[in-house]
C-alpha cells in the first residue's frame, strides 16, 4: 500500500486463481478457452450451444478432466477442467 496515496499497488498482488471445481458444481464451457485448445482442433467444429450456455453438473473429476452431465437427454462428456467455468 502506498503511503502517499493510500491506494493498493495491484502489480505486487498474486494472480487471481480460478476456484477449484468440485463434484456437484454447476458449470459451462468457456467458448474462447475451448476454441483455442488442442481438443477443439481434434473434435467436431459444430458443437451444441447448450454446452456454452450451461448449466452442466460435474459428476467426477480425474486429473485435469471433469465428467459433466447436461440437463438434456445426451451422454455425459469428459471436458478439460481448464475449459469450464462456474455457472
From Swiss-Prot:
NDH-1 can be composed of about 15 different subunits; different subcomplexes with different compositions have been identified which probably have different functions. Residues 1-23 are annotated as: Disordered. It catalyses: a plastoquinone + NADH + (n+1) H(+)(in) = a plastoquinol + NAD(+) + n H(+)(out); a plastoquinone + NADPH + (n+1) H(+)(in) = a plastoquinol + NADP(+) + n H(+)(out). Belongs to the complex I NdhO subunit family. Its EC number is 7.1.1.-. GO terms for molecular function: oxidoreductase activity, acting on NAD(P)H, quinone or similar compound as acceptor; quinone binding. This is NAD(P)H-quinone oxidoreductase subunit O. Its main location: membrane. It is a peripheral membrane protein. The keyword NAD applies.
Amino acid at each position: 500500500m502506498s503511503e502517499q496515496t493510500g491506494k493498493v499497488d495491484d502489480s505486487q498482488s498474486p494472480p487471481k486463481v480460478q476456484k477449484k471445481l468440485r463434484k456437484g458444481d454447476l458449470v459451462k464451457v468457456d467458448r474462447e478457452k475451448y476454441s483455442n485448445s488442442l481438443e477443439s482442433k481434434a473434435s467436431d467444429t459444430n458443437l451444441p450451444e447448450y454446452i456454452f450456455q450451461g448449466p452442466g453438473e460435474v459428476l467426477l473429476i480425474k486429473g485435469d478432466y471433469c465428467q459433466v452431465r447436461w440437463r438434456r437427454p445426451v451422454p455425459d462428456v469428459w471436458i478439460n477442467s481448464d475449459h469450464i467455468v462456474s455457472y
